Amino acid sequence: MTKEFHHVTVLLHETIDMLDVKPDGIYVDATLGGAGHSEYLLSKLSEKGHLYAFDQDQNAIDNAQKRLAPYIEKGMVTFIKDNFRHLQARLREAGVQEIDGICYDLGVSSPQLDQRERGFSYKKDAPLDMRMNQDASLTAYEVVNNYDYHDLVRIFFKYGEDKFSKQIARKIEQAREVKPIETTTELAEIIKLVKPAKELKKKGHPAKQIFQAIRIEVNDELGAADESIQQAMDMLALDGRISVITFHSLEDRLTKQLFKEASTVEVPKGLPFIPDDLKPKMELVSRKPILPSAEELEANNRSHSAKLRVARKIHK
């Protein structure tokens, strides 16, 4: 049975308006999720325009088919059930050589967090899962119970930036010697045991960073985003745009770096002009990230950490 997707779209108008949508253009929503961005983008297209929507979660696609039904009936939407790291290959299969714009809403979606059985949330007791693609083999259970101490420390530091990574990895090792760690609640309690009292008093759940680290590892989120954003920039038509929403510093740093590399060039001294093959292919539409408005922050608590970066194709 299809579960309802209750998802408040973050930075909805900013993300799509910054794409400067051409009514007859070809667009991609790389992270379909609750279909809010897709629906708003489609409202700006004529019947000659087309949207390709990616998601590796069948539940998201099932719900989007209902929400976007009027546009589907007009033949304006193609759903692609796959990880967006395969963006270029899947679009080529569909006969698409270039696109006029693409948007990303990175990270886990609100419905995935809210569905207890998906095992993403430290606030709800559930089996350790955290797979965005439920057909994938690697789960949070595998990471927590089978990764050795050094691998746990590596991902906790790298993806969670938690200063207690070593102590938490050691405590996990000790706990699983007694019995496997099977649920989100068990893991959260182990993490709490490690954190000093002053850390537990801080705003935010003490397990947040470790859960983020495990989720990123399970889904290879940063690796997939890196590959996909580079493919997207390659596929953009001249004057095409890319919008990327991030929710934590790792995603934002990655996006900022990819945009910087594509929009700057190191020209050897003494060259009278910049050769075509050295010209930057992108330019930043906004130098600083776009943040949610005060009204959105008040209405949607999950928008607090959101940042939007936008770039435009200026050279093929």
UniProtKB/Swiss-Prot annotation:
Protein's cellular compartments: Cytoplasm
InterPro entries: RsmH, SAM-dep_MeTrfase_MraW_recog, SAM-dependent_MTases_sf
Gene3D superfamilies named in the record: Putative methyltransferase TM0872, insert domain (1.10.150.170), Vaccinia Virus protein VP39 (3.40.50.150)
E.C. no: 2.1.1.199
Any one Gene Ontology BP term: rRNA base methylation
Catalytic activity: cytidine(1402) in 16S rRNA + S-adenosyl-L-methionine = N(4)-methylcytidine(1402) in 16S rRNA + S-adenosyl-L-homocysteine + H(+)
Keyword list, A-Z: Cytoplasm, Methyltransferase, rRNA processing, S-adenosyl-L-methionine, Transferase
GO cellular component entries: cytoplasm
Record-listed S-adenosyl-L-methionine binding positions: A35, G36, H37, D55, F84, D105, Q112
Any one GO molecular function term: rRNA (cytosine-N4-)-methyltransferase activity
Job of this protein: Specifically methylates the N4 position of cytidine in position 1402 (C1402) of 16S rRNA.
NCBIfam families: 16S rRNA (cytosine(1402)-N(4))-methyltransferase RsmH (TIGR00006)
Family: Belongs to the methyltransferase superfamily. RsmH family.
Protein name: Ribosomal RNA small subunit methyltransferase H
